[in-house]
Structure formats: structure tokens, C-alpha cells
């Protein structure tokens, strides 16, 4: 997320909109005459996806679909969709490549993979310039407290165990 005081958010050419992505009325008019629209909206806490998977499907899949339809309706020239490396599934060793098949292993990754499938279908149907990036773990200011780094630091301070998913051999990269 960009700081509200940064030069990019002060630009008259850039609009950062924080809203429910399903509610297209909140942003539809801003897409008119838009050169590039970026979708970074997401429910992203994997553990919560087991508790309320429909919220993840609503935001990550249906929300991306609603955003895409609105971009097409408003004739947005380019669309950038931020997905997740989680769509590859559990990989213990080796490297993931963007052309390999997705293998979602939890409700979060399934909702992101479903969005990618929808987006790709529109990319070819409407001949739109759409880019999907599969970001990995992002850490920084405004990090949600339930995320791994924040949780691990708090647990270590309190002499509690840190969360380990799977067999603990997975390697994760952070930006």
C-alpha cells in the first residue's frame, strides 16, 4: 500500500480506492478514460480462508470478476491483477515457474486461481492487455498483525512457539 503522503498519491493521474471491490459503484466512474487499472484487493490471510471461505471467494474471485467487467465496460486500456504465488500449491523444493499448472491447496489459493482463470478468459475473449503477477509475501508498514512475521515476533517475545505450516521445510520469500 502506498503512503497517503507519497508523491504517487498526490498525483492527479493516480487514484487509490479502498472499498469493497464487489461494489462497483464506488469506483466505476473513475475507470472512465483510465489507462491502467490495478487490482490489489484481496482477502489474504490463508488461515482465515478455512474459517470463512465464502468471503475469500466473494472478494478474490467474484470481486476480481466484477472489477474486470467494469474495466471492460469503461474501456480501460491495461489491467494489472495481483494474484499470489500460493496458486502453485505446496512446493517443498525447487522453483515455481509461471507457465506451470496451478495446484491450489487451500481456499485462499483456490479463490486466487479461480480469479486468474476468469481473467485469462477475458484477456483472450476481449483481446485486452491484462497482466497477472503472482506476488509472494509482502511485508512492511500496515502489515496485518495476524501475518507470519508479526505473529512470529510477538510469539518469540512471549516465549510462545512460532507457527509452522506443513512439515516446516517450505521456503518463503518476502518483499
Residue ranges of model-derived segments:
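N-terminal Rossmann-like NAD(P)+-binding domain of SDR-like oxidoreductases, especially those catalyzing
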Residues: 1-138
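NAD(P)-dependent short-chain dehydrogenase/reductase
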Residues: 93-94, 117-174
Amino acid at each position: 500500500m502506498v503512503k497517503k503522503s507519497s508523491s504517487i498519491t498526490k498525483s492527479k493521474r493516480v487514484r487509490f480506492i479502498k472499498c469493497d471491490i464487489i461494489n462497483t459503484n464506488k469506483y466505476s466512474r473513475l475507470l472512465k478514460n483510465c489507462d491502467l487499472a490495478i487490482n490489489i484487493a484481496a482477502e489474504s490471510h490463508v488461515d482465515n480462508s478455512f474459517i470463512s471461505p465464502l468471503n475469500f471467494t466473494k472478494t478474490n474471485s467474484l470481486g476480481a470478476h466484477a472489477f474486470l467487467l467494469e474495466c471492460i465496460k469503461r474501456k480501460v486500456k491495461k489491467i494489472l491483477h495481483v494474484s499470489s504465488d500460493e496458486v502453485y500449491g505446496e512446493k517443498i523444493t525447487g522453483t515455481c515457474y509461471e507457465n506451470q499448472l496451478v495446484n491450489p491447496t487451500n481456499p485462499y489459493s483456490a479463490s486466487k486461481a479461480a480469479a486468474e482463470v476468469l481473467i485469462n478468459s477475458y484477456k483472450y475473449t476481449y483481446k485486452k492487455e491484462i497482466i497477472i503477477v503472482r506476488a509472494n509475501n509482502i511485508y512492511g508498514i500496515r502489515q496485518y498483525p495476524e501475518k507470519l512475521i508479526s505473529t512470529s515476533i510477538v510469539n518469540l517475545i512471549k516465549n510462545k512457539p512460532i507457527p509452522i505450516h506443513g512439515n516446516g521445510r517450505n521456503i518463503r520469500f518476502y518483499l
